[in-house]
């Protein structure tokens, strides 16, 4: 049920057979120094689900992404991936276990050409060719120094290798930020392709329409707590507006 809000029958059958969540947060609090940003956040995500995390600025969405990826330490609570406690694992260890935070433009080597960047991340010629077919701009700019690309082009260069080997859980924190509409579309196409390959996607996106078009489920946050969690098709306009205005 891609983007319909209904899991497809396969997933539904699995769920009936007691499929374990791929990711579970139990009463997770987190913050920076003395300032707590997340207050007792709990939810489960099933394998293959697409979750849109919505909310006003300051709702704690980026902190949530960081806690799941391991770039922000959880102050308390449990964080389980496929049933394994993960709170003490580094971001690097989590990435090896398949929990990956979308690279920002810093996921590239700015001093090297586009081709050299792809060669480092994609070992095979077919893999590099596929990346350029998926993101034609990388073929056009193949000799250009990566640091001189536009933000959108850098984002596509950072995303390309991940699609060659999609992770189990991909956390995309505002993937369209600063991108032209065309570049944003190619990134969203890439995310959609990932989910079709079975990746569980956690999507934080200012363009709510884009996020909702892809999402099976929506989590709304306000001031560090989850205020709504349900199927995307049940989300009404009033609730959506309230989410962005902070009530």
What are these regions (language model features)?
Residues 162-163:
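ABC ATPase C-loop
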Residues 77-85, 97, 125-133, 228-230:
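Conserved ABC transporter NBD signature motif
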Residues 54-56:
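The feature captures the beta-strand-to-loop junction immediately N-terminal to the Walker
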Residues 69:
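Helix-to-loop junction immediately C-terminal to a conserved catalytic motif
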Residues 145-149, 153:
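Conserved ABC ATPase signature
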Residues 73, 85-106, 128, 142-143, ...:
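ABC ATPase NBD coupling module
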Residues 170-174:
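Catalytic Walker B motif of ABC-type/P-loop ATPase nucleotide-binding domains
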């Amino acid at each position: 049920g891609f983007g319909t809000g209904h899991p497809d029958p396969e997933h539904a059958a699995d769920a009936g057979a007691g499929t374990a969540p791929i990711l579970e947060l139990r009463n997770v609090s987190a913050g920076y120094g003395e300032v707590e940003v997340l207050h007792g956040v709990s939810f489960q995500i099933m394998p293959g689900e697409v979750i849109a995390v919505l909310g006003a600025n300051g709702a704690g969405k980026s902190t949530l992404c960081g806690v799941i990826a391991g770039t922000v330490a959880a102050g308390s609570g449990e964080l389980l991936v496929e049933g394994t406690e993960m709170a003490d694992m580094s971001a690097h260890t989590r990435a090896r276990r398949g929990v990956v935070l979308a690279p920002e433009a810093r996921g590239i080597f700015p001093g090297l050409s586009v081709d050299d960047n792809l060669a480092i991340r994609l070992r095979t010629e077919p893999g590099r060719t596929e990346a350029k077919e998926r993101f034609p701009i990388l073929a056009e700019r193949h000799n250009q120094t990566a640091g001189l690309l536009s933000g959108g082009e850098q984002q596509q260069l950072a995303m390309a290798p991940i699609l060659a080997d999609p992770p189990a859980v991909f956390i995309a924190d505002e993937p369209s930020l600063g991108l032209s509409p065309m570049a944003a579309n190619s990134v969203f196409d890439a995310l959609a392709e990932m989910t079709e390959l079975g990746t569980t996607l956690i999507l934080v996106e200012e363009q709510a329409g884009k996020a909702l078009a892809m999402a099976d489920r929506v989590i709304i946050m306000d001031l560090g707590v989850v205020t709504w969690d349900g199927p995307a098709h049940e989300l009404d306009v009033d609730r959506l507006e309230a989410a962005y205005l902070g009530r």
